[in-house]
């Protein structure tokens, strides 16, 4: 049963095996984690901009074979709208702290009832109703 949605920064730590502790937690949670299609898009973008796109895209494909990639759904989009409106109403709209991609990932996690695993807890604390934790 899925419990966690991994943020892009955590995926990068796992792939690079740094720090080692994050890889250990990742291995213990096998079958309970997924990534958002938004995270996959961010990873693919980074790989395409890298000095060795074919190799880095292959690494991403290998990583994605180990867990589920959740499609971004209409339900997630509705959560995005709700979260964005709530942040704007509080006078803390999307800006220097939460990037639009991050907000989509947060909305996706919240819409699926999953805990977002991120190294940016401070960014995501503003999102109402979002469960989050850091494995570092």
Where are each of the predicted segments found?
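Short, structured coil segments at secondary-structure junctions
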Residues: 29, 65, 127-128
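Alpha-helix capping/helix-boundary segments
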Residues: 10-11, 39, 76, 122-123
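Short, well-structured N-terminal submotif of metal-dependent ribonuclease cores
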Residues: 1-36, 45-62
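Acidic, PIN/NYN-like endoribonuclease modules and their adjacent C-terminal/linker elements
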Residues: 106-136
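Active-site neighborhoods of divalent-metal-dependent phosphate/nucleic-acid chemistry enzymes
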Residues: 68-115
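Generic structural signal for small/hydrophobic residues in well-ordered secondary structure
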Residues: 7-8, 43, 80, 109, ...
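Short, flexible helix/strand-to-coil boundary loops that buttress conserved ligand/catalytic motifs
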Residues: 15-18, 26, 47, 84, ...
């Amino acid at each position: 049963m899925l419990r966690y949605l991994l943020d892009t920064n955590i995926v990068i730590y796992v792939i690079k095996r740094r720090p080692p502790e994050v890889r250990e937690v990742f291995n213990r949670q096998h079958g309970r984690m997924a990534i958002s299609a938004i995270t996959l898009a961010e990873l693919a973008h980074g790989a395409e901009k890298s000095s060795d796109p074919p190799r880095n895209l292959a690494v991403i494909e290998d990583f994605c074979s180990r867990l589920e990639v959740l499609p971004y759904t209409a339900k997630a989009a509705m959560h995005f709208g709700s979260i964005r409106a709530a942040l704007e109403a509080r006078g803390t709209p999307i800006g220097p702290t939460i990037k639009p991609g991050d907000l989509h990932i947060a909305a996706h996690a919240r819409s699926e009832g999953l805990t977002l695993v991120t190294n940016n807890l401070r960014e995501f604390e503003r999102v109402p109703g979002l469960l989050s934790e850091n494995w570092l």
